[in-house]
Every structure is written in C-alpha cells, then in structure tokens.
C-alpha cells in the first residue's frame, strides 16, 4: 500500500497477513522487495503483539491510500520508480527515472526500451523488470441504500478494491 500526503507517493505501508495491522515500511526499496514477492510469500510483520503503526482512514482529507498490484518486480538498479498522484487524487501516473549523472524521466515502456538499448550499463536489464501498472486508490464502497434501511453500509472489510 502507498500512503499519500503530497502529490508524490513517498510513504509506504504493508498489511500483515497474520494480525492484519498496517506497518510502515522504511524505504521504497524495502517496500518493492515485499511487493515483488506477495504472490509467493505474504508480508508478516513479526510484531503482531504491538499496536499497528497507522490506521487506514479513508475519509481523511490529507491522506490517500493506494494499493499496488501484486508481484510488480523490483525496480532495476540504476532506475527509480516514481508515482505521482494526479490533482484529482483519484489516479496515479507511473514514471521511471534514470539516476545520476543525468536524470531522465520515462513515461512509457517504449522510452525505457530505447534508453536501455543506448546504455551499455543496462544491457542485462529486461523490459519484464519494468511495470507501468498504477496503484489503485482504496476507498470506502457504499452500498445502495434500500427503502427499508437508512443506514449506509460498506463491504465486509470496508474497502473497495475497485477503481
């Protein structure tokens, strides 16, 4: 999961499969390691007895929650995966940036392909290591109110996985 306080996603969290508590993840690299293995190994925090690091508040005006697809590969060495939230706070744009000495931002797989063809140090990198799949925003999903009930209901876990 990604936590957004600004237009750039720079905070990361994961939910423990055992205790279901949300844990802050130290760095983007650590988060990508967890995310790349989610289909073969679920995240386990090893601190289940302790309180969670944060609570997912979907009604917050200052924080938005986004969820990545499972098993997106780790970003290749020499590149950085950049996630930018659009101004409407609903969708995320994914970019890759080359690191020093000159930063260059890539908006498509075609641009990345051209870049790795031109750079000797990236000759071992494959395009399967790059994913422009954007995280989806998590939000409460309200069920339609029937004529016999005036309360608003949510899905069982309160989270909509739909975009």
UniProtKB/Swiss-Prot annotation:
Domain MBD: from-to ranges: 65-137
Coiled-coil region list: none
Highest taxon, organism lineage: Eukaryota
GO molecular function: methyl-CpG binding; zinc ion binding
Keywords for this protein: DNA-binding, Metal-binding, Nucleus, Transcription, Transcription regulation, Zinc, Zinc-finger
Annotated spans, Disordered: 140-163
PROSITE patterns, alphabetized: MBD
One GO location term (cellular component): NuRD complex
Compositionally biased residues, Basic and acidic residues: 153-163
ZnF (CW-type) intervals: 6-56
Pfam families: MBD
Subcellular location: Nucleus
Cited function: Probable transcriptional regulator.
PANTHER family per record: METHYL-CPG BINDING PROTEIN, MBD (PTHR12396), METHYL-CPG-BINDING DOMAIN-CONTAINING PROTEIN 1-RELATED (PTHR12396:SF10)
Domain writeup: The methyl-CpG-binding domain (MBD) functions both in binding to methylated DNA and in protein interactions.
Name the UniProt record assigns to this protein: Methyl-CpG-binding domain-containing protein 3
Taxonomic placement: Eukaryota, Viridiplantae, Streptophyta, Embryophyta, Tracheophyta
């Amino acid at each position: 999961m990604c936590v957004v306080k600004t237009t750039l996603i720079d905070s990361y969290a994961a939910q423990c499969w055992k205790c279901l508590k949300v844990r802050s993840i130290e760095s983007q690299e650590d988060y990508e390691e967890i995310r790349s293995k989610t289909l073969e190994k679920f995240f386990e925090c090893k601190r289940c007895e302790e309180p969670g690091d944060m609570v997912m508040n979907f009604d917050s005006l200052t924080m938005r929650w986004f969820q990545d697809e499972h098993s997106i590969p780790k970003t290749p060495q020499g590149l950085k995966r950049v996630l930018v939230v659009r101004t409407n706070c609903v969708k995320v744009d994914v970019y890759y940036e080359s690191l020093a000495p000159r930063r260059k931002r890539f908006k498509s797989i075609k641009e990345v392909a051209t870049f790795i063809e031109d750079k000797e140090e990236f000759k071992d990198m494959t395009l399967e290591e790059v994913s422009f799949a954007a995280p989806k925003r998590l939000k409460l999903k309200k069920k339609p109110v029937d004529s016999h009930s005036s309360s608003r209901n949510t899905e069982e876990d309160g989270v909509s996985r739909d975009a």
